[in-house]
Amino acid sequence: MSKTAIVEIFNSKFPIGTEVTVQGWIRTRRDSKAGISFLAIYDGSCFDPIQAVVPAALENYSDEVLNLTAGCSVQVTGELVESPGKGQQFEIQATQVEVLGFVQDPDTYPMSAKRHSIEYMREHAHLRARTNMFGAVTRVRNCLSHAMHNFFYEKGFNWISTPIITGSDAEGAGEMFRVSTLDLENLPRNDTGAIDYKKDFFGKETFLTVSGQLNAETYACALSKVYTFGPTFRAENSHTTRHLAEFWMVEPEIAFADLADAAQLAEDMLKYVFNAVLTERADDMAFFAQRVDKEAITRLEKIVSSEFVRMDYTDAIEILQNCGKEFEFPVAWGVDLQSEHERYLAEVHVGAPVILQNYPKDIKAFYMKLNADGKTVAAMDVLAPGIGEIIGGSQREEDLVALDKRFDEMGINKEDYSWYRDLRKYGTVPHAGFGLGFERLVSYVTGVQNIRDVIAFPRAPGSADF
């Protein structure tokens, strides 16, 4: 007998009177004095469980059905009928209930039917996907991921799988995880006493990637429009709700493009994926709006219908200095903006997303194109109401002389980037791109504040469980 996903029932793909078989887990069991049990069954295909009405006449009713608790897995067959109860359109009049797996000790089951704190569920990350909260997060994350790929496919982009193991620091910040097979208790040394990485697996120092951008640029300079979507790693000893040591990045790169092109692409992308999640995951978004963040839906709707405002960094500094608000972190030209500054600009001053452009070169990465003023680079951040920065990008420096000068100014050995410099030697073109931290996007969409709660198994300082 074919199995039916619960979402297909709720989408009215089966007429009343059809015999259906569903497989899933028990959310709750309720018994009536009339000798009937009501099982709320979910299978993860949608937010709402379906109710199965189980009569006492079933052969295994007393010894199995009445022992079902939250988390038990079952297969239920029965007739699909209209539900007389409020809040549900359909239910199943069960003719067969097969128990596939009992919860061995319901009293110690970590994800029992009672409500648990986010912190508690984080300690049981291997089981938390069984809850309403994390099931909804997972489906929204999946929807956003699918929409992201669709957006770039429709725009003619090629998806590039960039390496996870790399010998280059794309950010120049040095906060990287080293990859090595050397014996830590017997490290080889060279003549100067330093560790001899020539004896290591790759014959050189290697790290987990902090960004696929530099690799993506090589393909953009051949295929014109590419993007990466994969895991990245930062060895930042940060314990905030906005940082992870392992997270996913979306990084498009476009050739024959400038900063304005990258900014427009970022705006179009955000509107596309927000519209997709509002349309395709209405049930999950309704849950987030009710239980997590009452603005979850209206925030996205407003962004989809808004024009993103372009603003120069220099103008933003002047606005912040003259707004009359006292900030925790002082504002001055040449300093990087803090979240409080970004949110003021997007939420108070503009009331819509802001694309902040043309930052001082001294606070930005080596690969960003120097502007004509010699003081700023063609960089941008997309600031969204409710979170601040959500995207960072730039036009890339396509001139080899200018790039080498930046390497020298920042004390970076340009020979380590010889392959990257080759792009400027052989048919260089203006090109631009940006990076989006995917978990930060999921957090923004769902209203879930801690970024550790929008990825299946969070990796953070002192935490690499499961």
From Swiss-Prot:
Catalyzed chemical reaction(s): tRNA(Asn) + L-asparagine + ATP = L-asparaginyl-tRNA(Asn) + AMP + diphosphate + H(+)
Pfam assignment, any one: tRNA_anti-codon
GO (cellular component) term, any one: cytoplasm
Principal cellular location given in the protein's record: cytoplasm
Keywords tagged on the record: Aminoacyl-tRNA synthetase, ATP-binding, Cytoplasm, Ligase, Nucleotide-binding, Protein biosynthesis
Subcellular location: Cytoplasm
GO BP term (any one): asparaginyl-tRNA aminoacylation
An annotated Gene Ontology molecular function: nucleic acid binding
Entry's EC annotation: 6.1.1.22
CDD domains: AsxRS_core, EcAsnRS_like_N
Family: Belongs to the class-II aminoacyl-tRNA synthetase family.
PANTHER family, alphabetized: ASPARAGINE--TRNA LIGASE, MITOCHONDRIAL-RELATED, ASPARTYL/LYSYL-TRNA SYNTHETASE
Quaternary context: Homodimer.
Name of this chain's protein: Asparagine--tRNA ligase
Gene this chain is encoded by: asnS
